[in-house]
């Protein structure tokens, strides 16, 4: 999926609004995913997936940091996410549908917190961005 110049501007602007809340929002998105799609917990058998868990917070920060890195490398998402793609495809063997589920939960989380700051155009751009990230993360499954 090709990100337009407007999409890239919307993504960067939204990431600036997220600011220092990335880890918090990442953890909340994971909690939302675990609650809404319980089968996703099977990839975290060693985690305490309860609300406020230190492990979920830590992984939420990793998710947020990876997405922030991707948002800063919009012209080279495959390069920015190559190591994560390898990890998820070859070591963790995560079902690719889970990236879409987490992306949806992240959009809901951002809409909850940013409210009017997440315009329809920004929402559409983030949706395209998360779909692109999902595509890159699953590219090494083939």
Curated annotation (Swiss-Prot):
GO CC field: blood microparticle; haptoglobin-hemoglobin complex; hemoglobin complex
Sites of Phosphothreonine modification: 109, 135, 138
All residue ranges annotated as the Globin domain in the record: 2-142
Signal peptide residue numbers: none
Residues recorded as bearing Phosphotyrosine in the entry: 25
Binding residue positions for O2: 59
General function of this protein: Involved in oxygen transport from the lung to the various peripheral tissues.
Family note: Belongs to the globin family.
Subunit structure: Heterotetramer of two alpha chains and two beta chains.
Protein name: Hemoglobin subunit alpha
Source species of the chain: Cricetomys gambianus (Northern giant pouched rat)
Protein encoded by which gene: HBA
């Amino acid at each position: 999926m090709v990100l337009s110049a407007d999409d890239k501007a919307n993504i960067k602007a939204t990431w600036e609004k997220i600011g220092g809340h990335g880890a918090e929002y990442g953890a909340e998105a994971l909690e939302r995913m675990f609650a809404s799609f319980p089968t996703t917990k099977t990839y975290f058998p060693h985690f305490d997936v309860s609300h406020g868990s230190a492990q979920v917070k830590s992984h939420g920060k990793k998710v947020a940091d990876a997405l922030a890195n991707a948002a800063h490398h919009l012209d080279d998402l495959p390069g920015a996410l190559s190591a994560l793609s390898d990890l998820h495809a070859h070591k963790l063997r995560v079902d690719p549908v889970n990236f879409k589920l987490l992306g949806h939960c992240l959009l809901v989380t951002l809409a909850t917190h940013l409210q009017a700051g997440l315009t329809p155009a920004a929402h559409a751009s983030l949706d395209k961005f998360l779909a692109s990230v999902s595509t890159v993360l699953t590219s090494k499954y083939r």
